Amino acid sequence: MEEISKSKQDGNSWEPTGNPKVLWTALIAFTYGFSVWAINSSLAPYLKDWYGYSASEVLIVAAMSPLFAAVTSLVLGIASDLWGGRIIFTLLLLFLPLPMIGYMFADSYVAFLCVGIFMGLGGASFIIGNTHVAVWYPKERQGAALGLYAFGNVGVAVGMLLVPFLLNTVLGGAPGTDLPPKLSLGPFEGWRLIFPVYGLLSLILAFVYWTVTSEPPIRNKKITFASIGSVYKSSTLPWILAYLYGATFGALMFNSAFLPTYLVDQYDIEKQKAIMVFVPIFVLLVAGSRPFSGWLGDKYNPIILLVYCLGAEVVLAAALSMQLAFPWQMSLLYAIAIFYGTGASLVVKIIPLYFKEVGAVTGLAKTAGASTGAVMTIVMSAVKGTTGEYTYGWLIWAGAIALGLILALRVQQRS
């Protein structure tokens, strides 16, 4: 594969034709970022046992990462438009070890909430790499390129697999529990040693990203704070696309935070099996569907395809509210996962077709997606706490997707 695909240059004009180095480096860094995001969800069932927290309490801890990602994604998207993905992604990777240091000292519920918030920056990495990759590829190839980049969603599965593997085979857990520490480093032992490993990897990736990637030879000078502000005011389309991203990509955020605790609480699945088997399969189905669906968005009308995806999601989400026997419930979850990933890729494909401020609009969409993850996890926690079951939570989710379907049909009619 060429180091950098040749781009057409003539004076001040420049047309992107691709940059594999940026694409693959961004994919690796994004995968790492999402594996960081998964740490809270992976630890939640263990914290429930070690500290005696309720299912509702650990769901709130798991919701902190997507909540902060929602707050920061819009800012990082705008920053990537203005100053480029290379410097913004490098700075993010340099910052991520700081909350990990905090996790090494956390020993109360409030402390876990606080450090869990800042781990959400790993999830916010998506918007930076998405913007960086998009500027290097022409519109007719952006669907495939961004779909491949979005395979980095698999980082959630990596985190789900790596954390319990390290706990159970290498590091151990917490003192005085059924999973005692196996290794120690000064005052730190067992599960807390996950964070120095992750922090060191973040610093290495920061060096690699800055060294290997590059910015386009001619940046889009037309993108300014004023132009970014005007795009939010120009029409309702950025806000509709943001909602649609919440109904697709947001589902990954919601389910990756919610499912480990849900499977243990609702179906009495052993926590290691829930985290290392059932949830990673769900994430792999979401991530695996994104490259192909991005390619489909290049070949066919992405808005029409999105309408069909959302229709399927509504039906499957309503079926999940029936709380079927475990094999059937997992079959429904795995089926809907494919439509989540497909729909998310289609929304990402649609954005550059309408807007040059890809980072700003995608940042708004990512904010909606991460907010969906946080809000729906909290909704499920509240529903469980008040009714003793999750049925109404799934119905609320089906209703939210149905609204997205109505909005997508409006966009289709206008286009």
Map each language-model feature to its residues:
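Extracytoplasmic
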Residues: 21-53, 76, 255-260, 376
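Extracytoplasmic gate region of multi-pass secondary transporters
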Residues: 40-44, 236-291
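Central cavity-lining transmembrane alpha-helices of secondary-active solute carriers
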Residues: 60-77, 280-292
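Conserved MFS/SLC helix-loop-helix module at the cytosolic interface between two early adjacent transmembrane helices
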Residues: 71-109
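Cytoplasmic helix-loop-helix junction between adjacent transmembrane helices
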Residues: 115-152
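Glycine-rich segments within core transmembrane alpha-helices of 12-TM secondary carriers
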Residues: 143-171, 366-376
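C-terminal membrane-cytosol helix-exit motif in multi-pass small-molecule transporters
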Residues: 168-172, 199-219, 407-412
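C-terminal transmembrane helical hairpin of 12-TM major facilitator-type secondary transporters
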Residues: 300-347
